[in-house]
Amino acid sequence: MAAAFEASGALAAVATAMPAEHVAVQVPAPEPTPGPVRILRTAQDLSSPRTRTGDVLLAEPADFESLLLSRPVLEGLRAAGFERPSPVQLKAIPLGRCGLDLIVQAKSGTGKTCVFSTIALDSLVLENLSTQILILAPTREIAVQIHSVITAIGIKMEGLECHVFIGGTPLSQDKTRLKKCHIAVGSPGRIKQLIELDYLNPGSIRLFILDEADKLLEEGSFQEQINWIYSSLPASKQMLAVSATYPEFLANALTKYMRDPTFVRLNSSDPSLIGLKQYYKVVNSYPLAHKVFEEKTQHLQELFSRIPFNQALVFSNLHSRAQHLADILSSKGFPAECISGNMNQNQRLDAMAKLKHFHCRVLISTDLTSRGIDAEKVNLVVNLDVPLDWETYMHRIGRAGRFGTLGLTVTYCCRGEEENMMMRIAQKCNINLLPLPDPIPSGLMEECVDWDVEVKAAVHTYGIASVPNQPLKKQIQKIERTLQIQKAHGDHMASSRNNSVSGLSVKSKNNTKQKLPVKSHSECGIIEKATSPKELGCDRQSEEQMKNSVQTPVENSTNSQHQVKEALPVSLPQIPCLSSFKIHQPYTLTFAELVEDYEHYIKEGLEKPVEIIRHYTGPGDQTVNPQNGFVRNKVIEQRVPVLASSSQSGDSESDSDSYSSRTSSQSKGNKSYLEGSSDNQLKDSESTPVDDRISLEQPPNGSDTPNPEKYQESPGIQMKTRLKEGASQRAKQSRRNLPRRSSFRLQTEAQEDDWYDCHREIRLSFSDTYQDYEEYWRAYYRAWQEYYAAASHSYYWNAQRHPSWMAAYHMNTIYLQEMMHSNQ
């Protein structure tokens, strides 16, 4: 299956990349003179040899000069590839230039974008720098495409300023562009926002255009935003509404926005394109949705392997299913991209650029690209799911057969409900829907490679220069000649040792002096040109003649022939999956870089305004934004003499170190906990030791003063006892003067009252106690840091090298403290 797809990809001039071991070979002779270079032609170029239908051809030939357009617009149309107008262009452009309100309906891909672009450019006053024309589109991709068409046609108009305003871009950039903008193209949401912020002045708008008007004015879609924008525009303006489909209710509703509108409707009873063959395939229905998806995917792979095509669009009704299908096709050897509404703006624009520049063969999409997207190389459209309405179906299949060309559409539907829905759509649109033949014949696609395309592989910005342009025939000849020369050269070396040198070996030695530099396929973009079937047949004949003519007495052995036959399939162009075009460089991130990347994704990746109110930077620094209801707490370390004596015993030193490490993490990593409950703080300061260990979480053991007899082991512990006794006495005095509040009440009050009352009591009753208590344990923490700073313990340095371990330790400490706090 994949091999057949690769063969069709070679016919459709897919961008291919060959491994380095097959490219870096010895060249025996100079290359022959290359043939004429084919020119890339656009879909609207009627002079190309592509087949055209009556959708774009006129009974009597006409040109744009007969429309009395300005000279810069005529030159721009010619430069953009528009040589002769289509029927809708010939009828609508003169009416629009007269200032009439128009409702234009024509088939997909017949030049409707060129209609309003030409009208807009011809009515523009370049000396007036204010915004004169406003164009709205339902999706960002359509807005970007309209902007590209206007700039292409207006290339000869000096000083033209046309900008696109869509979501996902900074408002500051839009504000700067609107200072000098003749034509504003955008989505309804962003345009409304710009008007509300007074960045866009609607009073200067003279022409208001709705592209895909049926979608913009659909109830529950953009109707409220369109009404708001329309009400802010001046009354004396011209309005154009353009679309391929118009439901009956919408045609009547549009008259409310316009003054005596003129209808330009071509083939309203037959909206399907003449050059499109429409097929459907009924698949088995299963209770589980993933079983249906698997069967449709298998049929899709079979379709790709049997039908040669230039590019294909596959539509799905679900976002998740589209991404999953793209992954499956890429893993099977079919290069596929995905685009959907849940992707960010950069990813969506990148996928569209790859489709239009022929950097991907298959694009899996939702209905995001079903309207207005113009990719002239697409000649196959597949509906993996039946669309929900007939308008969506007509817009989907309109992505193929652009500007009167030929194309093919296939719709997969399950037996039962989906099949009945597809039949209703066919009856509503009056289309000739045929069942897909089984097996699929090879000649189902009438037009596959009978027009010229130029394909370029995606080149990375950090890549190296690409390989020179070489046709497929020359590459095969190079590979064969190289294998023959290598074989002859090996025989020559063997014969030279036996003092028998043949003429062929001498010739091969002279020819092997030229070498091709080694380049991998990831560093090179190999450019291929499409050839006609006749040329491919000539190539095969020339290959066979070359095989018969280059055989020498040295190469008559069966081993050499077998080697050439085995090397040929490997040397043929392969179609790698899309991931092979991307260079994945190994890179190790630190914990700080991971945190920075995560915060960048949270703030910008989701396209939502997100403000980070708390930054955790370590055990000694907790930075909080005071504007969000918190207080910026930062431990200010002061130099205090070390209280612990160096003559402490090993057991007491270990106890003090373990206690100090726990307390330092509590006082610095979770300072709010130490200040949260006055009762718990009193109990922690008055706790008695158990088994020669001290713990802040232990409840009081009956008395408020600790037993001094258990602390006679070292002077450091005596100092600790005196500090704790003084702290408890001051706490008793403060408790007699102030009303006592229970910890349970502090936890159950409202958040603001709890925060202010709790901190007011702490400041009044424990200011001195907490200061001495904090200074004491800060000295222990400083001593612990100074001790390990001078040590060369590998575990400590590993902990410093991997701060994620320390972060996990502190987070776990806070979590345990909160659990114990709630239990108390």
From Swiss-Prot:
Catalytic activity as recorded in UniProt: ATP + H2O = ADP + phosphate + H(+); a ribonucleoside 5'-triphosphate + H2O = a ribonucleoside 5'-diphosphate + phosphate + H(+)
Compartments in which it is found: Cytoplasm; Nucleus, Gem
Residues covered by the Helicase C-terminal domain: 299-448
Protein role: The SMN complex catalyzes the assembly of small nuclear ribonucleoproteins (snRNPs), the building blocks of the spliceosome, and thereby plays an important role in the splicing of cellular pre-mRNAs. Most spliceosomal snRNPs contain a common set of Sm proteins SNRPB, SNRPD1, SNRPD2, SNRPD3, SNRPE, SNRPF and SNRPG that assemble in a heptameric protein ring on the Sm site of the small nuclear RNA to form the core snRNP (Sm core).
Domain spans labelled Helicase ATP-binding: 93-264
Motif (Q motif): 62-90
Gene encoding the protein: DDX20
Molecular function terms from GO: ATP binding; ATP hydrolysis activity; DNA binding; DNA-binding transcription factor binding; histone deacetylase binding; mRNA binding; protein domain specific binding; protein-macromolecule adaptor activity
Region (SMN interacting) residue spans: 456-548
UniProt-listed CDD domains: DEADc_DDX20 (cd17943), SF2_C_DEAD (cd18787)
Compositional bias per record (Low complexity), positions renumbered to this chain: 645-667
Motif, DEAD box: chain positions: 211-214
SMART domains linked to this entry: DEXDc, HELICc
Descriptive protein name: Probable ATP-dependent RNA helicase DDX20
